[in-house]
């Protein structure tokens, strides 16, 4: 099963030394989690929270966590770091998305409003 969509990186949690689990809020498919491997220091900045990415998710079955690959579209990291109020607002929105939305439920209207 393959899914390709535009999304916002919501969280990144370590799994092993260079392996992480990322959570992405996609435009047409909702929240998806996937395993990524940071192979070099060059692609570390891609997986920062708040970045808009071209998200590719592959798994054998729909229920599996899957392997994720991301291509950076736009980075908002510097935009949030400059202003504390924007950083707090962003963190609040991220927390709400994680708590209120279920995995793999489409929320394209909210995605459009948040961008």
Curated annotation (Swiss-Prot):
Instruction: Please list every transmembrane segment annotated in the UniProt record, as residue ranges.
Output: none
GO process annotations (BP): DNA recombination; DNA repair
User: Which Pfam families did the record assign?
Assistant: RecO_N
Q: What protein name does the entry list?
A: Uncharacterized protein RP548
């Amino acid at each position: 099963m393959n899914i390709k969509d535009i999304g916002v990186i919501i969280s990144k949690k370590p799994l092993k030394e260079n392996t992480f689990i990322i959570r992405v809020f996609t435009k047409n498919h909702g929240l998806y989690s996937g395993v990524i491997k940071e192979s070099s220091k060059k692609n570390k900045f891609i997986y920062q929270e708040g970045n808009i990415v071209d998200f590719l998710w592959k798994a054998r079955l729909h229920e599996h966590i899957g392997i994720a690959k991301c291509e950076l579209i736009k980075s908002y990291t510097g935009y949030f770091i400059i202003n504390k109020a924007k950083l707090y607002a962003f963190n609040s929105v991220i927390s709400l998305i994680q708590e209120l939305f279920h995995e793999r439920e489409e929320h394209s209207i909210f995605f459009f409003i948040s961008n």
